[in-house]
Amino acid sequence: MVDNLEPLEPSLQNLVEQDSLKWIFVGGKGGVGKTTCSSSLAVQLSKVRESVLIISTDPAHNISDAFDQKFTKVPTKVNGFDNLFAMEIDPNAGLNELPEEYFEGENEALRVSKGVMQEMINALPGIDEAMSYAEVMKLVKGMNFSVVVFDTAPTGHTLRLIAFPQVVEKGLGKLLRLKMKVAPLLSQFVSMLGMADVNADTLSQKLDDMLRIITQVNEQFKNPEQTTFVCVCIAEFFSLYETERLVQELTKCGIDVHNIIVNQLLFLQNSHDSCSMCASRFKIQEKYLDQIADLYEDFHVTKLPLLEKEVRGPESIRSFSENLMKPYEPKGKPKE
């Protein structure tokens, strides 16, 4: 490392202070504490932003466990907060599992559109998961949250989430090119069902609206002023390898990433007084922390402790979230 380079602040203070951010993704390998970190970040953002939404896109839906509160597919206020909301979606469920609020309308047209749309998108490989993200994004954008934090599934799912606007743009483009063929068929279909008042262009208009929103989201995802990604890892080989792969893929996708959280670290006061396993783990972690420092010298690297108790419940998360803002100092650490 070059000695005269000033190291970047080892916290997420830079993200919390960046008022322009609209979308923050938190991801990494399974089991590294992504949910605790994303929930803690959302709590800190709620102190300085008007309204914050945290969305879980992991089918395991750990944010319900983290906040000790059941969340659904509709944004729900988190207990103990006035401006923090949470929701959980399953991207594998497809459009049929989304709540009816996503397909509002005064007549049967939109309900027909939902079914027809599901059938049509099933014919396009990879677009079903992307379209469920798209419908959620449409809902979220309409609610005008100041910032949205995504608690993502393990890496493979995360990369698909990041790429979904491009997948949807491509898929909807194909559908819209077919709309002249689809509209007459839809007209015949709804007439057979006795719904003569339904406008055959309803589906086409819905697709047009969706494409417009997704194009906008795609532009925002590629704008570092509006979107960034926080990688969470632990100081072990496989986690570090996965983090490097994730950083490279994000860079390839044009997504900003300049924050890494290293979680579950041992902060030993005196390795001689520690058990042999703790001392051994400490040495392993030190080795990988050195590698992280070399690999990511132009990143904000935040180090979080391994705690004796799990972080669960709003007050516990609120307390733990302070570690994102200033470097963790173990209790009883001797003054230098």
From Swiss-Prot:
Enzyme nomenclature, EC number: 3.6.-.-
Catalytic residues, chain numbering: D58
Membrane-spanning parts: none
GO cellular component, one term: GET complex
Gene3D superfamilies named among the record's database cross-references: P-loop containing nucleotide triphosphate hydrolases
Domain of life: Eukaryota
Keywords of this entry: ATP-binding, Cytoplasm, Endoplasmic reticulum, Hydrolase, Metal-binding, Nucleotide-binding, Transport, Zinc
Keyword Metal-binding attributed: yes
InterPro entries per UniProt: Anion-transp_ATPase-like_dom, ATPase_ArsA/GET3, ATPase_ArsA/GET3_euk, P-loop_NTPase
Gene Ontology molecular function: any one: metal ion binding
Location of this chain's protein in the cell: Cytoplasm; Endoplasmic reticulum
Biological processes per GO annotation: tail-anchored membrane protein insertion into ER membrane
Family: Belongs to the arsA ATPase family.
Quaternary assembly: Homodimer.
Cross-referenced NCBIfam families: GET3_arsA_TRC40 (TIGR00345)
HAMAP family: Asna1_Get3 (MF_03112)
Name of the protein in question: ATPase ASNA1 homolog
Originating organism: Drosophila erecta (Fruit fly)
